[in-house]
């Protein structure tokens, strides 16, 4: 059965053990799916996934989805109405100004930020779990990690894939709330806590503007960009 692809939505999820791609119609009926199996690995005491496997897995899941569309509906998959990305929250992906990865991806599974989480929780008066991105960043400061000399962006796995597809450095407010506390009144990062973090960073010898490192925060329905030619080639 032929389907109206312009009214369809493509969802991609990068979970702990599978990367999944699902196509649904305007009535939210699943039409086709594809997947890629992967697993995190322990390298030098850190739970991580290689970034090249992110690309390979997304391509494989999309290819399987396209094959399923052809098998079930007898048509190619040249376009869709919209794309949504979901992935493991939290963790730490640090990049330089040209979006080169500075250190291996630190996933939410890592419990290596106890000192940072405790200090930030006390300073903010707000619970900061070890898995949160800001805890990983501050722990890197406490550890005097060399990659901080070049850091220009931090994001999550979903944020990174969104950037690869659209060129837009942004997160939905839900994902963003796993990086840094959100002010419920503004729907943006908490300004007072951002200031406190910058003050703590300065005491550690780092002149950071944390807000400049973080992705933009978008609420549901906001314009999050469009698939670029580079993003389409990735798929």
Predicted ranges, named:
Residues 20, 57-60, 230:
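Residues within well-formed alpha-helices
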């Amino acid at each position: 059965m032929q389907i109206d692809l312009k009214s369809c939505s493509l969802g991609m999820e990068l979970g702990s053990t599978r990367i999944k791609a699902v196509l649904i119609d305007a009535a939210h009926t699943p039409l086709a799916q594809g997947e890629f199996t992967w697993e995190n690995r322990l390298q030098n005491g850190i739970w991580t996934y290689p970034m090249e496997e992110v690309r390979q897995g997304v391509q494989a899941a999309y290819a399987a989805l396209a094959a399923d569309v052809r098998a079930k509906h007898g048509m190619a998959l040249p376009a869709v109405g919209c794309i949504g990305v979901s992935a493991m929250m939290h963790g730490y992906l640090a990049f330089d100004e040209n979006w080169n990865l500075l250190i291996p991806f630190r996933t939410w599974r890592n419990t290596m930020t106890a000192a940072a989480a405790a200090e930030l929780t006390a300073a903010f008066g707000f619970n900061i779990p070890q898995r949160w991105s800001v805890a990983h960043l501050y722990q890197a400061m406490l550890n005097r990690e060399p990659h901080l000399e070049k850091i220009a962006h931090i994001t999550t796995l979903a944020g990174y894939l969104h950037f690869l597809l659209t060129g837009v450095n942004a997160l939905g407010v839900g994902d963003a709330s796993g990086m840094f506390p959100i002010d419920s009144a503004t729907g943006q990062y908490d300004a007072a806590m951002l200031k406190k973090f910058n003050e703590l960073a300065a005491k550690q010898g780092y002149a950071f503007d944390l807000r400049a490192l973080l992705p933009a925060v978008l609420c549901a329905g906001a314009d999050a960009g469009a698939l670029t030619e580079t993003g389409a080639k990735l798929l």
